Every structure is written in structure tokens, then in C-alpha cells.
Amino acid sequence: LKRAFLALVAGAVAGCVSAGADRFRNNYPHPEKTGFWKWKWEQWRDGLPRRPEGGYRFETAKSDFSAALNPSVTWIGHATVLVRVGGLSILTDPQFSERASPVRFAGPRRVVPPAPGLDGLPHIDAVVISHNHYDHLDLDSVTKLAAQPGGSPRFFVPLGLKDWFSRQGIADVVELDWWQSRTFKGLEVHFVPVQHWSKRTLTDENLTRWGGWVLRHPELSFFFAGDAGYSKDFADIRARFGGFDLAAFPIGAYEPRWFMKIMHMNPAEAVQAHKDVNARQSLAIHWGTFDGMTDESLYEPPQRLAEERRKAGLSDEQFFVLKHGETRSLAHR
């Protein structure tokens, strides 16, 4: 019974990628992906995902938010990244909860605490949300950020999500469609297409946009891919923007490939995406944080990334991995 309930919870946030006439679609056609219940059956049959004895152990680092490091990037965990540039602090896909789920007692569970937690952050000026899946849009996290001392950050969200924020009492929200942009305190904020999908309930699949974000400042150009399968969208983004000082690409939640390929890149595809967008450096995200999302070990993505870097002739610094909470200073342009 417990397995059946957990599968239903997962179905609310996974399922198939489809689009009716009134629903958003990806830019580049792909087969409609079905087979969620087949995947769940295979997990049950094969005892996946397999976990190490004693559970996962990840080393965390103490974040450094000193002004001397600006611009800088801190990986808090999963797709939550703090970028500091020009006196601004910008947070991506804030997820600080114990579970990535519509309920608190089931669903993918955190194996390492957010580093730092919400109370350890500097004042957040802006938040960008890639899409509405529970591991990227967390109700408790965004409501606490909106109530931070000194006032709410400005939330930049995909088309169709502003109404959800309004229902939570969050008013400082800018909603954008693909290729639209706004300027905020000297920072250009662009919403760009990536290949993924959206779903938050059993009936709202693909009723809101999904995408990545480009942040452009005189001191830093940054591309946040959010959650994405590999597609020609990355080449399109390079054609528009030329390249980036830093990109953040997902490298985890990719097995089994027959089911996950459309929606989640693997490390080899992430390396190709790094090349496609012409990033000087890339940061690995979307791995090592929540257990139970897909079949591969949480330890596997950075190991495979190291192999793919070597094959592509990239250095560790060109596509780097941070510990949870670790801050990296970025060279000025």
C-alpha cells in the first residue's frame, strides 16, 4: 500500500510529457513520452533505486557571502543556486524543504540539508523560477522568502504562474514568456526556452510555461538551464546571446534513459549543452540532493561528468562540481 501511494505522489509530479491543443509545447518535436507506470513496475521488480548501506553521505561546505568574492556562485543544493553580482543576490528555484512533494509525509526526500538554510542567506533581491515541479517550486520556501526582513524579493516566473503566486499572497511577481525580458536594478533578466514540461496537480499538465533564465550584468553573464532534456534550444540561446561567463546545467535524474531522456539530460548531454551555449564555465546542478527521483545512484552523476569532461577535453574548472554550500568566486570580465 505504501508503494502504491508513493507511486501516486510521484505521478502527480512526473508522468508523461504531453500537450493538448490548449497546452504549452516544446519548440522541437519529440515522441510523446509515456510509460510512467512501466517505470514504476521496473523499479519495484528490480529493487531500484539501490541505496548504499547506511545511506548517502555528502560533505557540505560553509558558504562565503563576503562582498570581496563578488561576483560569486553558491550551490545550495539541487537546482537552488545563489548568484551574487553588482550588489545583488539572485536565487534560482528555491527548494529548502525536507521533501520535493505535494505532501510532507511522502515523495522524494532530502539526503543533505540545504547549505545554508533560509536563515543563513543574505537578503535576496530576485528569484527566478524555471517551472512548477515540486523540486523547483516549493510553497514553503517561496512564502518564507517573500516574508524576509527588508521586503520580498522580486519573483520572475514563467507564463501562467503569476496566478499561483497571487493565491499565496505574493505580489512582487513578473511573469514572462519565452524570449521576453525585463531589467531589474541594472540586471537584464531573460526567459528562454528549454525542453521540459510542467505539472503540479493531476489536471494541470503543461498549462504553465517552463524554461531557463539568462541574467546579464556588466560584471557577469549567467545562464540557468533549470531542468531540461537536451535539445536544439541551447544552440538557439547561443545564437541570441553569444555565450556566457557561467552556465548551470542539470546533470542528474537521468535513468532510465528510455523514460527520462526527453525531460532530463545525462552528463554527456550536459557537456554538449555547455559547448552549445558557449559557456566559459559551467556548474553542475540537479544532483545529489533528493533521493527517489530516478534510478541512478546519487553518487553517479559527478563521476560520469568527470568521464565526459575528459572525453571532451574539458578541464575540471570548465565544468565544475561544488559541495553543497560551497561558494566559488567568479573572475571579472
Regions inferred by a protein language model and the residue ranges of each:
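Active-site metal-binding motif and surrounding structural segment of the metallo-beta-lactamase
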Residues: T34, F105-F156, D172, G242-A248
